[in-house]
Curated annotation (Swiss-Prot):
GO molecular function term, any single one: magnesium ion binding
Keyword vocabulary terms for this entry: Cytoplasm, Isomerase, Manganese, Metal-binding
Family named by the database record: Belongs to the phosphopentomutase family.
Source organism per UniProt: Streptococcus pneumoniae (strain ATCC 700669 / Spain 23F-1)
Record protein name field: Phosphopentomutase
Coiled-coil intervals: none
InterPro entries registered for this protein in UniProt: Alkaline_phosphatase_core_sf, DeoB, Metalloenzyme, Phosphopentomutase_DeoB_cap_sf
Cofactor binding: number and manner: Binds 2 manganese ions.
One GO term (biological process): 5-phosphoribose 1-diphosphate biosynthetic process
Binding locations of Mn(2+) 2: 298, 303, 351
Location within or outside the cell: Cytoplasm
Taxonomic classification: Bacteria, Bacillati, Bacillota, Bacilli, Lactobacillales
One Pfam match: Metalloenzyme
Amino acid sequence: MSKFNRIHLVVLDSVGIGAAPDANNFVNAGVPDGASDTLGHISKTVGLNVPNMAKIGLGNIPRETPLKTVAAESNPTGYATKLEEVSLGKDTMTGHWEIMGLNITEPFDTFWNGFPEEILTKIEEFSGRKVIREANKPYSGTAVIDDFGPRQMETGELIIYTSADPVLQIAAHEDIIPLDELYRICEYARSITLERPALLGRIIARPYVGEPGNFTRTANRRDLAVSPFSPTVLDKLNEAGIDTYAVGKINDIFNGAGINHDMGHNKSNSHGIDTLLKTMGLAEFEKGFSFTNLVDFDALYGHRRNAHGYRDCLHEFDERLPEIIAAMRENDLLLITADHGNDPTYAGTDHTREYIPLLAYSPAFKGNGLIPVGHFADISATVADNFGVETAMIGESFLDKLV
């Protein structure tokens, strides 16, 4: 019999809580990640007021320097810890895949100097559109459309760029390159980047609208991932007949593997929370696992190095956390975590190699406190333990610590 009938896992995309032990092996604009600290630096530089997460135990998580504006609770309502990544990567897919029990020992391919001519030529031949070569390099997603959007509006050329992550991104103005055409081109790009030396984690469609000087990316983003190389705990749950619900880009990240209810993409964090609440309220969702990604922290503020916006986004989530808690049933478990860091005060524009926080809450809890510091995959091991299925590759359950 399951200890919890339902588990709801919410990933606050990029909300790291301090540099990982191996952070100096990863860089941002040539600067090692060893001094990165997403929550710590936000708290220190612009202040952070998240009383509802603090109540569960956010301020109790062990750190060399406590969060400046998030106090420890003497009697928290839940359990807390931080988790370390073992996989060789700091991207979204690697983080989520490890959270679900995989160890990525060979990182996907990245292209610091842009994609090879062979790939660009193939995309041109398939699409009938030229590719803007000057954009073919690691680029900020907002800067690349500011720099090349006007040219695309004049010529219809494709904007193809990358980042420090193993991704190929295609930006297209919706009035110039229709969505169905953009998605079709991305599907082709996916088909030619499935093997080394160009094994990419994701192909991302990045549509935008507006006029030069005032471009805005839309919610019609699509991520085309590769399927996980080994079964995850999502697959184990699915095989056991236990319902799995995906909110936001989770279905894309796992390429649908192990997910039998895709609740759709998020237009915003707020929309994602609305969808989660709707999912939690489904009468037929009596037992199972929901998995939500809220990406605005990362996409809108982390990469853009906007500490004030990031803080406000955290405030907005915290203000809605009581709604999520109110939607829980007596034997539900809520887990709040992240997938990597993206320190908005740090060098560069890319993710940072950090610990991730873990907050656990249930109306059924009689106790509270700290869970031992562990690893990302401990989350999936705990989910597997609860529902009586096999774990994936790695992870140790902390289910017995939740009382």
